[in-house]
A protein has these predicted regions:
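Non-catalytic, solvent-exposed segments at the cell envelope interface
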Residues: 2-10, 18, 30-35, 44-580, ...
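Short, Lys/Arg-rich N-terminal segment immediately upstream of the first membrane anchor
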Residues: 14-26
Length: 586
């Protein structure tokens, strides 16, 4: 008998194997291969998740560094790089496929959408605009306009998707926190991107009146509306198309703005007939429209699409970002910088020119106009430090030195949602209980460069009632001798350096009434009592202040209902008002 070879024995064993064994191995093979693929895909997905996490954390760190005072350009470069990496990783086909997995898919989608949104902000908007700002090739707005418009369109669906994800209960804590954080940023940024092209004249030229207030003659919203500049925005290009000063409007009288008898009683019969007094009422929209009416009656019929207020205090902060500017002075060029701008604009100019004379008025008007033009040129060209400019603008808005009004309802609604930029008092107490305390010079002087002010306010709750007590103190910090040496234009038009007439207006929180008053000083009293404005009880005081004198007025308001935390709105003064607030109700 011939024995089978090894190969023949192996073949025979294979032929005699049970079908169930072969099927088992086949099943194991079919199970093992997909399992291996899934494990590899999960490993790849885990790697991509780690990449996204690392990149987003790095981007966040760069932003925090910039907010803490770091270099903005470097931060933008870092955010751009990390956001691009995160968006690329989250856009991986494996990632997108995994988004259909129940529960986990929602979290992956949340991370992806957040990463893609940051990528659009950083790489389709932020970095290109920053590069334009740094390239020194002139005005950036016309070049940046299409970038902003395209970026806004790309960002809009991501903004909407993130807003919807905020309420998704499937998101785990870290993912939801990141989604909410990015969504909140986009909810503020998206309206800007949507509105900015139109504001810059992408859909037709827009005309904006720039109003310069003089804080040396304080009025509730800032100071005498001494100078105006008309700026035209046309497809991103900005140009000065007209300028005027307060003397332009001398003797103009009524300009057709409807003013109630109550307002004339509260602010005086000349309110609405003199442009410098247009900022008397602490409501920038009404003041802006009044200034526009003056312009249209005396200068030209240019349609005013909006008005922006700025004062020397804001200007000094802006000069920190742009660097010094040079303006022709009485005996050669004058350098204005962030340290000397307020002093020069609010005191030195009155030493150089006597504005009561025709020649002096022309000289000072030309100086202010040249200053406005130089600052406009520096800002519109993009020749400034981005971090310092962001601080200058935000600080000035917070202190009331920059305000804006737009005729377009959608644009105005956005401004009003932006807080103090609108220059209006809240209409209720749901978010804050805002008390208005405003100062007003009525001596036709520029003495308030030397005026020091303070406000002390408190909120208490007892027996179902809420009380707000506020005191305002004014100190005219100049000696009689020094006051007598001041230029005539700085002294009181009526009383020289003998005394200066001042008003203080307390605007009660909505729903509160006057409970009591108190006054300290040689000549101070309440006047024009029983008035309401802007839905609030108003408590006005008048005083006469010789050099070196101090006056304090105090009012307690009382009311029942719900009141938010106490806050103060006040006049931006040359010497910043010292404010103390205590609130034992919250």
């Amino acid at each position: 008998m011939t024995l089978p070879t090894r190969r023949e024995a192996r073949d025979e064993k294979r032929r005699s194997a049970k079908p169930t064994d072969r099927a088992r191995r086949r099943r194991l093979l079919w199970i093992g291969i997909p399992s291996l693929v899934i494990l590899l895909l999960l490993a790849w997905l885990g790697f991509r998740v780690l990449t996204v996490k690392t990149s987003l954390e790095a981007a966040q760190a760069s932003l925090q560094d910039a907010q803490a005072g770091g270099d903005v350009s470097s931060a933008i470069e870092s955010v751009s790089r990390e956001a691009g990496t995160a968006a690329s990783a989250a856009g991986d086909p494996v990632w997108r496929a995994a988004e259909v997995i129940p529960w986990a898919g929602d979290n992956l989608r949340g991370v992806r959408v957040a990463a893609e949104a940051l990528d659009v902000v950083a790489n389709r908007i932020g970095k290109p605009v920053i590069d334009m700002q740094r390239d020194g090739q002139g005005s950036i707005l016309s070049r940046a306009l299409p970038v902003i418009a395209d970026g806004g369109e790309a960002l809009a669906p991501l903004t909407a998707e993130l807003a919807a994800l905020e309420t998704n209960d499937a998101l785990i804590g870290p993912v939801k926190g990141g989604v909410v954080q990015v969504s909140q940023v986009l909810s503020g940024l998206q309206p800007v991107l949507d509105l900015l092209p139109g504001l810059l004249g992408a859909d037709g030229a827009k005309n904006y009146l720039l109003v310069f207030q003089n804080n040396a003659e304080s009025l509730p919203l800032g100071g005498s509306a001494a100078s105006q500049t008309m700026i035209r925005a046309d497809n991103g290009s900005l140009a000065i198309v007209g300028q005027a000063s307060s003397t332009t409007f001398d003797g103009i009288g009524d300009v057709g703005v409807e003013i109630s008898d109550a307002l004339r009683t509260l602010y005086g019969v000349t309110y609405g007939t003199r442009i410098n007094m247009s900022v008397t009422r602490p409501d920038w929209p009404s003041a802006a429209q009044m200034v526009a009416a003056f312009w249209n009656k005396r200068v030209d019929k240019t349609h005013v699409d909006g008005a922006i207020s700025i004062d020397p205090l804001a200007l000094s902060r802006i000069l920190l970002a742009t660097g010094p500017i040079t303006v022709p002075g009485p005996e050669g060029d004058i350098e204005l910088n962030n340290e000397n701008a307020v002093e020069i604009l609010l005191t030195k100019t009155y030493e150089w020119w006597d504005a009561y004379t025709p020649e002096g008025g022309v000289g000072s008007d030309a100086f202010f106009a040249a200053t406005a033009a130089k600052v406009f040129e520096a800002v519109s060209s993009g020749a400034f430090d981005l971090k310092d400019m962001a601080w200058a603008v935000s600080e000035s808005i917070d202190r009331g030195s920059i305000m804006a009004w737009m005729e377009d309802p959608e644009e105005q609604a956005f401004i009003e949602s932006s807080g103090k930029l609108a220059g209006i008092l809240p209409t209720d107490n749901s978010v804050e209980t805002a008390l208005g305390v405003y100062f007003r010079d009525v001596s036709a002087s520029k003495i308030d460069y030397y005026l020091r002010t303070s406000i002390d306010a408190s909120m208490t709750c007892a027996d179902g009632l809420t009380r707000v007590t506020a005191s305002a103190t004014m100190n005219l910090d100049i000696t009689q001798e020094a006051a007598e040496a001041l230029p005539a234009y700085v002294q009181s038009y009526r009383n020289g350096s003998t005394y200066y007439s001042k008003h203080v207006f307390f605007y009660a929180p909505p729903g509160m009434e006057i409970e009591s008053m108190r006054m300290e000083g040689d000549w101070v009293k309440p006047f024009r009592e029983g008035n309401m404005d802007l839905g609030r009880v108003v408590a006005p005081f008048e005083s006469r202040m010789p050099p070196g004198s101090t006056v304090t007025v105090e009012v307690t308001f009382v009311g029942d209902g719900e009141f938010g935390p106490l806050s103060i709105r006040s006049t931006p003064m040359v010497k910043p008002t010292e404010v103390e607030v205590s609130d034992t109700c919250h």
